[in-house]
Amino acid sequence: MMKSKMKLMPLLVSVTLISGCTVLPGSNMSTMGKDVIKQQDADFDLDKMVNVYPLTPRLIDQLRPRPNVARPNMTLESEIANYQYRVGPGDVLNVTVWDHPELTTPAGQYRSSSDTGNWVQPDGTMFYPYIGKVHVVGKTLAEIRSDITGRLATYIADPQVDVNIAAFRSQKAYISGQVNKSGQQAITNVPLTILDAINAAGGLTDTADWRNVVLTHNGREERISLQALMQNGDLNQNRLLYPGDILYVPRNDDLKVFVMGEVKKQSTLKMDFSGMTLTEALGNAEGIDMTTSNASGIFVIRPLKGEGGRNGKIANIYQLDMSDATSLVMATEFRLQPYDVVYVTTAPVSRWNRLINQLLPTISGVRYMTDTASDIHNW
């Protein structure tokens, strides 16, 4: 009888140990015996590295971004007023000498003017009867007309010359990224601006980051806000495009916020063209969990960059107390920024319930061991 009882004891111990392991949820990893690299700031005080601001109507008003207003762009207006197209290699010119059809290339019934015009050669010249090669690259139409007129005067009395461009093929700007029709756009005798180029490309896609468009001109990058330009009429964001310019519209992958904690659906949310408010973020996460959340502990954690980070602070934390439902008005006015973390804390009673749930397997295991031991004793 005693031997049978002893044989059952290892089984009871195993049941107890397995049940006890469930007290600590999730996985854990010990650093003992591992090569831990010491850090100079290992003893940092996290409380001193953040700023905590209770959300108030006044604070929200201070944080509210000031709207861009419609402003003229005098520099752009001057550039457009003085704009002149200069011919480049590959362009096709049409030269007309009035009352001299033998010098005027006829387009013909089935041929376009670009097919029958005068091609500008790679060496920058084009050929014209009587006067031979004419250097045209880098010149305006008025300069080319004057040159041809002067040289034809040797052969024709008082020549009446007209020059126009049949095909613009030498100079291009490039539109890429999140537009509906990316590709190259010809620089013509009509000035091409950023707004013109975006419209010609079919507009922006739903995944475009219109706040951080990149214009590369002469090897230098400049950030352009199409939001300010297209939504608020800030013409200072518009630019004249020149040959070789690249306009890149990035994806909005970086325009996201994170909703964590006691919400019904923890999520990573993408911001759309109009941005996102705290209320929208909580709504997209299907709201806070009313059974486990602490309505007074809704936090927005905003990482600090630049000057804030250099002052030893790593984040600003904004706290919203939603125990009074009227505070949703403030949440609606509080605009989130990319990489904000919205965190909803746990209510104290919920933490107690979770502790009980974690202890139940152990309690059950101990009870099972006790009952089994009693059965063995009475066996």
UniProtKB/Swiss-Prot annotation:
<keyword id="KW-0762">Sugar transport</keyword>
<keyword id="KW-0812">Transmembrane</keyword>
<feature type="lipid moiety-binding region" description="N-palmitoyl cysteine">
    <location>
        <position position="21"/>
    </location>
</feature>
<dbReference type="InterPro" id="IPR054765">
    <property type="entry name" value="SLBB_dom"/>
</dbReference>
<keyword id="KW-0564">Palmitate</keyword>
<dbReference type="GO" id="GO:0046930">
    <property type="term" value="C:pore complex"/>
</dbReference>
<feature type="signal peptide">
    <location>
        <begin position="1"/>
        <end position="20"/>
    </location>
</feature>
<keyword id="KW-0732">Signal</keyword>
<comment type="function">
    <text>Probably involved in the export of the extracellular polysaccharide colanic acid from the cell to medium.</text>
</comment>
<keyword id="KW-0625">Polysaccharide transport</keyword>
<dbReference type="GO" id="GO:0015288">
    <property type="term" value="F:porin activity"/>
</dbReference>
<keyword id="KW-0472">Membrane</keyword>
<keyword id="KW-0406">Ion transport</keyword>
<keyword id="KW-0813">Transport</keyword>
<dbReference type="GO" id="GO:0000271">
    <property type="term" value="P:polysaccharide biosynthetic process"/>
</dbReference>
<keyword id="KW-0270">Exopolysaccharide synthesis</keyword>
<dbReference type="Pfam" id="PF02563">
    <property type="entry name" value="Poly_export"/>
</dbReference>
<dbReference type="GO" id="GO:0046377">
    <property type="term" value="P:colanic acid metabolic process"/>
</dbReference>
<comment type="pathway">
    <text>Glycan metabolism; exopolysaccharide biosynthesis.</text>
</comment>
<dbReference type="Pfam" id="PF22461">
    <property type="entry name" value="SLBB_2"/>
</dbReference>
<dbReference type="InterPro" id="IPR003715">
    <property type="entry name" value="Poly_export_N"/>
</dbReference>
<keyword id="KW-1134">Transmembrane beta strand</keyword>
<dbReference type="GO" id="GO:0006811">
    <property type="term" value="P:monoatomic ion transport"/>
</dbReference>
<keyword id="KW-0998">Cell outer membrane</keyword>
<keyword id="KW-0449">Lipoprotein</keyword>
<comment type="similarity">
    <text>Belongs to the BexD/CtrA/VexA family.</text>
</comment>
<dbReference type="GO" id="GO:0015159">
    <property type="term" value="F:polysaccharide transmembrane transporter activity"/>
</dbReference>
<keyword id="KW-0626">Porin</keyword>
<dbReference type="GO" id="GO:0009279">
    <property type="term" value="C:cell outer membrane"/>
</dbReference>
<feature type="lipid moiety-binding region" description="S-diacylglycerol cysteine">
    <location>
        <position position="21"/>
    </location>
</feature>
<protein>
    <recommendedName>
        <fullName>Putative polysaccharide export protein Wza</fullName>
    </recommendedName>
</protein>
<dbReference type="InterPro" id="IPR040716">
    <property type="entry name" value="Wza_C"/>
</dbReference>
<dbReference type="GO" id="GO:0015774">
    <property type="term" value="P:polysaccharide transport"/>
</dbReference>
<dbReference type="Pfam" id="PF18412">
    <property type="entry name" value="Wza_C"/>
</dbReference>
<dbReference type="InterPro" id="IPR049712">
    <property type="entry name" value="Poly_export"/>
</dbReference>
